[in-house]
Amino acid sequence: MSALLRSEARKALATSTVSWLLPLTAVVGVVGTLAPLVASSPGTDPLSDDGLQQAMHGAAAGATLVIVAGIVGTAGEWRFGQSTQTFLTTPRRSHVLLAKGLVHLAIGSIYGIAAGVAATAAAWGWYRSNGHTLPLERSAVWLTLLGCLAVSALFGLLGVAIGAIARSQTTAIVGVLGWHVLIEPTLFTASPTVFRWSPGMASFALRRQPSDDFLTAGPAALVLVAFIAALCAAGLRSVERADVTA
């Protein structure tokens, strides 16, 4: 298994998409952090728990890009005709998918750490320029950052699962972006009570975006993990039944 993990890690790190998505995720995290601070109303207290969470949850604003990296790492093998070689080398397809999942869980964590550091630096600069000190010791800050890191790591695994199910890189990426950016927010707006249980809204809750309509962080984490586990099972079934020459 260790050799398989090293192989999958080398393939992931050699993929240019994974390399340029890392700084892009950090940039989006900085924008997601500064935007609510700059746009906040004059009477808003930036040092309140809600104010801190509103700013710091933006560290995971680019987490959708982590899903894209996971999709590329899995569906890309079919797109570029590498699946035959991969599964001939390691016939146990479940082992291959597990290795990909673990590698992209780690990549998601790296993306999350990079985005968290960049977002914290940006927030620290904004607070300082406005006569405040960013209270890093406050739970509203570090629990939010931990939630952002968890979302980023889990989204790496989610991308692998989606890529395994779809096996079409373009279809999977377009579908994820359409669902996450357009469809899911629209459904949530129409019925918050029902669609707060959806995976995207659970991820917002886990990263502690302030809203009375979201789940609390604990149930949100369970929802997200259960959803990803179900997709991983579906992805494994799809890969095991797939024609690797396709």
Label the predicted regions.
Residues 70-89, 94:
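Transmembrane helix boundary and interhelical loop/hinge segments in multi-pass membrane proteins
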Residues 16-73, 97-166, 178, 182, ...:
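Secretory targeting signals
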Residues 32, 167-204:
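Transmembrane helix segments
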Residues 18-21, 83-86, 96, 171-173:
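Alpha-helical transmembrane segments and their helix-entry boundary regions
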Residues 11, 75, 86-88, 159, ...:
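Helix-capping/transition residues at the boundaries of transmembrane alpha-helices
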Residues 8, 90-92, 162, 168, ...:
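Generic structural signal for small/hydrophobic residues in well-ordered secondary structure
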Residues 241-246:
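Short cytosolic juxtamembrane segments of multi-pass membrane proteins
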Residues 1-13:
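A short amphipathic helical element positioned immediately N-terminal to and/or at the very start
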